[in-house]
UniProtKB/Swiss-Prot annotation:
Transmembrane segments: none annotated. InterPro entries: SfsA, SfsA_C, SfsA_N. Belongs to the SfsA family. It comes from Rhodospirillum rubrum (strain ATCC 11170 / ATH 1.1.1 / DSM 467 / LMG 4362 / NCIMB 8255 / S1). GO terms for molecular function: DNA binding. Disulfide bonds: none annotated. PANTHER family: SUGAR FERMENTATION STIMULATION PROTEIN A (PTHR30545:SF2). This is Sugar fermentation stimulation protein homolog.
Amino acid sequence: MLFPTPLVEGRLVKRYMRFLADVILDDGTAVTAHCANSGSMASVKEPGSPVWLSESPNPDRKLKYTWEIIRVGDAYSGVNTGTPNAVVAEAIAEGKIPPLAGYARLRREVKYGKTSRIDILLEDDAAADDAPARPRCYVEVKNVTLKRDPAWDGPIDFPDAVTTRGAKHLLELADMVDQGHRAAMVYLVQRTDGGAVAMAADIDPAYAAGLKTAIAKGVEVYCLGCEVDPLRGIWVNRALPLIAP
C-alpha cells in the first residue's frame, strides 16, 4: 500500500483520549492529529518519538492530520488500525499469501453472522468442468504492534488490551467453519522488527484461550510482517510463525 501523498514528519508530544495525538511538526507547528487506534498502544506512543502524519485534502475535516507511523528505536511501526485491512487485501490480490490466493472475488466489510462484518470475504466461481467452487473464506485481520522483548527478532504480542470484540470474532470464525466455509485470522505485524507473533495471555487470557479453541475447530491462522517506509508506504514482506497459545 503506497501513500497517495507524502507524509508530514514531526515529533510526538502525547497521545490522549484514545483518538487524539499532539505533534510538533518539523517546521515547529503544533497540531492535533487523529489517532485511528483504540488500543493501549503500549510500546508505540513514547513522547518525543519521530512520527509521520497523513494530510487530508478535505478542507471541512475537523482534524487535518492522521497519525500513520512512529519510529521506535531503529524500527518503524504503523499505528493506524485502518491500514491492515488494505495491506492484507493487497497482499491477497498479489498472491503473497498462497493459501488465500486465486479466489475470483475479494470483498471487504461484508455483513455476516448476526450483527458483524467480516474484514475480507473471498469467493470463487464454479470450475469450468462443473466442479464445485472452493468454499467461501472469511478473513479477519488484526493489527499487531506490542513489543516487549528487546531483541530485534523478538515476538510481537497481541492483544495490547483486553478485547471482548476480538474474542467474539474468533467465535464467529469458528461458526463459519462449522457451516462448511473456510475462516482465517490474519495477524499483521505493522512493524519492521519482530520475528514471531505471540498471544499476550497475561493481558487477555480469554482471547488467548479463544484462539486455541478456534484453531482446534479449524480456523486458519496467518502471521505476516511488514515493510513500513515513511517515504513510500506499508506492505507485506515476510511470513512469521505463531508461538502457540
